[in-house]
Amino acid sequence: MKIKIIKYDGTEMFYDALSFEFRTNQISNWIKIKFNNDETIVIDNVCVIKTID
């Protein structure tokens, strides 16, 4: 699945991900993205997440 992420500062990022998990707390919103090669990254200060067909 393709994911578009927009951070609060306006930065846009695109990823081709296997899956993702979104979490929020009092400090920040963050997304954990897992890729097909078992690599995982975490991005914080996420404002918008959009999946693209």
What residues fall within each predicted segment?
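Generic cytosolic/nucleocytoplasmic N-terminal low-complexity/intrinsically disordered segments
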Residues: 1-6, 31-33, 44, 49
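N-terminal acidic leader/helix
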Residues: 1-29
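Short, flexible beta-strand-to-coil junctions
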Residues: 6-10, 34-37, 52-53
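Structured surface patches comprising rigid loops and adjacent beta-strands/short helices at the edges
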Residues: 18-21, 38-53
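Short, surface-exposed secondary-structure junctions/capping segments
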Residues: 25-40
